[in-house]
Design a protein with these regions (language model features):
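Leloir-type glycosyltransferase catalytic cores
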Residues: 11, 73-125, 221-247
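Short, solvent-exposed loop/turn segments at secondary-structure junctions
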Residues: 9-10, 38-41, 62-65, 133-137, ...
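Short, well-ordered secondary-structure micro-motifs within conserved domains or adaptor modules
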Residues: 26-60, 188-195
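Donor nucleotide-activated moiety binding/catalytic core segment of transferases
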Residues: 26, 158-211, 215-216
Length: 247
């Protein structure tokens, strides 16, 4: 039985996605749940699935994809370039299947930035960019508020570097980051630190090393050891592109 958990807001993109899931996902005669993000009653619904040991999938915007418009209402701008992630039993893809280069080549031909190009040739970075996940994700995954996570991260970073720490939160209408481009903050950036933010992709695609949680989507190609923030041990190009191909 395919169960798509509906969001009441009629503009939510899930209403477009669920019709495709309900039509095309094989029904194996047991409850299989689908949740769009963490809105509505989804957090409680996911907890119930875990308690009942019922299969569930978390659906949200894709990792390597053309971006959607979010405000004032979400819109898919280009269906051919837009992908969504469907993660089994997790908010993020932690285990992937290595694909042939064909998929990445297809994305690149569509004009999507999908290729790891290497690391900076020199150490010209000046600041650390701190990019927390949303308050909801931070609380669910780290068990503390976003503000608490930011303060903990700042204290830890300051133990090992005296570089400026620059905060960048998710751009939302009315906040200071609304209408800005993360690429501007990545200029002269030494490293990006996050818990689960997809800003890790932006950094890696722009030659910047990343420190992130082990169970984040980019955990396999990022570091946890803040002690090494001045002298990162960066992964090699084939390994990072292989990870991109899994997503």
């Amino acid at each position: 039985m395919i169960i798509t958990h509906k969001i009441k807001w009629d503009k939510c993109l899930s209403h477009q996605i669920w019709s495709a899931i309900e039509k095309g996902w094989p029904d194996e005669g047991r409850p299989v749940h689908f949740f769009w993000g963490l809105a509505g009653n989804n957090i409680a619904g996911i907890r119930e699935c875990i308690e009942k040991n019922e299969e569930y999938y978390f659906v949200d915007t894709g990792y390597i994809s053309s971006q959607i418009t979010r405000y004032p209402e979400p819109k898919i701008l280009d269906e051919k370039k837009t992908y969504f992630r469907i993660c089994k039993g997790s908010f993020h893809t932690n285990i992937g299947k290595v694909n042939t280069p064909a998929r990445l080549e297809k994305l690149i031909k569509l004009g999507i930035d999908a290729e790891f190009k290497g690391w900076r040739a020199d150490d010209r970075g000046k600041h650390i960019l701190l990019c927390p996940s949303s308050p909801t994700v931070t609380f669910q995954m780290n068990g503390i508020t976003q503000d608490e996570w930011i303060e903990v991260a700042k204290r830890e970073i300051k133990k090992y570097t005296d570089r400026e720490i620059r905060l960048r939160n998710k751009p939302r209408p009315g906040n200071k980051w609304w209408g800005t481009d993360i690429k501007d903050d990545l200029k002269d950036c030494h490293a990006l630190v996050t818990n689960y933010s997809l800003s890790a992709f932006d950094a890696l695609l722009n030659y910047i090393p990343v420190f992130a949680e082990a169970n984040s989507v980019m955990g396999p190609v990022t570091s946890r050891d803040i002690k090494k923030i001045e002298k990162q041990e960066n992964g090699d190009l084939p390994f990072l592109n292989r990870r991109f191909s899994e997503l």
